[in-house]
Amino acid sequence: MANYFNTLNLRNQLAQLGKCRFMAREEFADEASYLKGKKVVIVGCGAQGLNQGLNMRDSGLDIAYALRAEAIAEKRASWRKATENGFKVGTYEELIPQADLVVNLTPDKQHTSVVQAVQPLMKDGAALGYSHGFNIVEVGEQVRKDVTVVMVAPKCPGTEVREEYKRGFGVPTLIAVHPENDPKGEGMAIAKAWAAATGGHRAGVLESSFVAEVKSDLMGEQTILCGMLQAGSLLCFDKLVAEGTDAAYAEKLIQFGWETITEALKQGGITLMMDRLSNPAKVRAYALSEQLKTIMAPLFQKHMDDIISGEFSSGMMADWANDDKKLLGWREETGKTAFETAAQFEGKIGEQDYFDQGVVMIAMVKAGVELAFETMVAAGIVEESAYYESLHELPLIANTIARKRLYEMNVVISDTAEYGNYLFSYAAVPLLQEFMTTLQAGDLGKQAQTSTSVDNAQLRDVNEAIRHHDIETVGRKLRGYMTDMKRIAVAG
């Protein structure tokens, strides 16, 4: 198999990278009805598998789980989760031949073996679904020509897919049909019904392509969504402790700070996040973010280049073949960091204190979001896709850190995201060491800002620059669709 994207000519590469259409609410008037009365079999019962299945069942679909025979015989976690939630469970041989839609929600590294196992069992004209297109785009999986191949990609971890659905809402979602596999022309109808069944139509759906989803998803998770949060956590914690802050207090400020800061980001973009600061702190955060963008731009560009070329995926797949030696080593090292092992502060930190004491954290968020967005758009990815893969998903990832620090983030995200996170953070931490030595009183921690005055013209220019960045323009439009957004922060 060859990397699918690299087999396309330049015109097709650009066309697929740039495919993105915001779908109107009216297009989902039938909700999940196209799949009602049909059999949907999910392969895999991890975070996405279980939670999408719960939503789809609650939306009236017939859901069952196909698991490997040994997982059933040994009553592994996947079997327990499916059976404890009242789902029908069977082997591939028992369930796949009856399925109208087979949804592959196993980890990326298992996709090739899973798809090769289920394809011979699928009935003629059935559909195969993914929630991430890595197997199709990067691995180059070849699927039978009578099989329709679709994707529904919720833009958040599986746990949040369920939580937002239970709140009566949903999460923004990308849907796509693989152009090489739509023999009956029903791919879009299947994808729309599946997206509606998960609740995604209530938060906004983009019609995209497998290529655009994969390339933008990899870029977002490696840089701002996971890599920047991990690098920022380690750098800021070490800086606070080195300057005399109690380690437990520093840990809590960082652990819950990202979530509190990005809740403002979710509700009102970078503009609202920056507006939570005093005017002197806002001007300072803006200056810090501009410095960070200059320092980090080449790193962001390298990640985008390696994703587009396939260099990233080939390196990760080589690690798969080596029993995840790099991934597991990086995971172990992260677990031993001072931030991860620090005691928990039992006192309360006020909501505004997270902003006032986290000026450089806000600068990191602003710089990372804007750089990820700008770098994706420069590579041919449409602004709406770049927004969802940089700004919108960030509060959901920050929420995982608030639960159990970096450990929880890396457990919840995919192995693909985790591998990319380590690549970025291991490069970003040394890259930003010198920058961290230039921080002033008031940039991080309890020390007061050294300046309490602001030049009116400078403040005006800063506000204009913040509010008129392209990500703020597209963000205002997309957030207008999400009128039912629910607050998720749990900071204490």
Curated annotation (Swiss-Prot):
Entry keyword annotation includes Transmembrane helix: no
Domain KARI C-terminal knotted per the UniProt entry, residue ranges: 209-344, 345-485
Named cofactor requirement(s): Mg(2+)
Binding residues annotated for NADP(+), in chain numbering: C45, G46, A47, Q48, R68, R76, S78, D108, K109, Q110, G158
Keyword Membrane attributed: no
Alphabetical list of InterPro entries matching this protein: 6-PGluconate_DH-like_C_sf, 6PGD_dom2, KARI, KARI_C, KARI_N, NAD(P)-bd_dom_sf
Example of a GO MF term: ketol-acid reductoisomerase activity
Gene3D superfamilies reported for this sequence: N-(1-d-carboxylethyl)-l-norvaline Dehydrogenase, domain 2 (1.10.1040.10), NAD(P)-binding Rossmann-like Domain (3.40.50.720)
UniProt keywords, alphabetically: Amino-acid biosynthesis, Branched-chain amino acid biosynthesis, Magnesium, Metal-binding, NADP, Oxidoreductase, Repeat
GO biological process assignments: isoleucine biosynthetic process; L-valine biosynthetic process
SUPFAM superfamilies in UniProt: 6-phosphogluconate dehydrogenase C-terminal domain-like, NAD(P)-binding Rossmann-fold domains
Co-factor: note: Binds 2 magnesium ions per subunit.
Catalytic activity of the protein: (2R)-2,3-dihydroxy-3-methylbutanoate + NADP(+) = (2S)-2-acetolactate + NADPH + H(+); (2R,3R)-2,3-dihydroxy-3-methylpentanoate + NADP(+) = (S)-2-ethyl-2-hydroxy-3-oxobutanoate + NADPH + H(+)
Pfam families named among the record's database cross-references: KARI_C, KARI_N
Family matches, as NCBIfam families: ilvC, PRK05225.1
Family membership: Belongs to the ketol-acid reductoisomerase family.
Function: Involved in the biosynthesis of branched-chain amino acids (BCAA). Catalyzes an alkyl-migration followed by a ketol-acid reduction of (S)-2-acetolactate (S2AL) to yield (R)-2,3-dihydroxy-isovalerate. In the isomerase reaction, S2AL is rearranged via a Mg-dependent methyl migration to produce 3-hydroxy-3-methyl-2-ketobutyrate (HMKB). In the reductase reaction, this 2-ketoacid undergoes a metal-dependent reduction by NADPH to yield (R)-2,3-dihydroxy-isovalerate.
Record protein name field: Ketol-acid reductoisomerase (NADP(+))
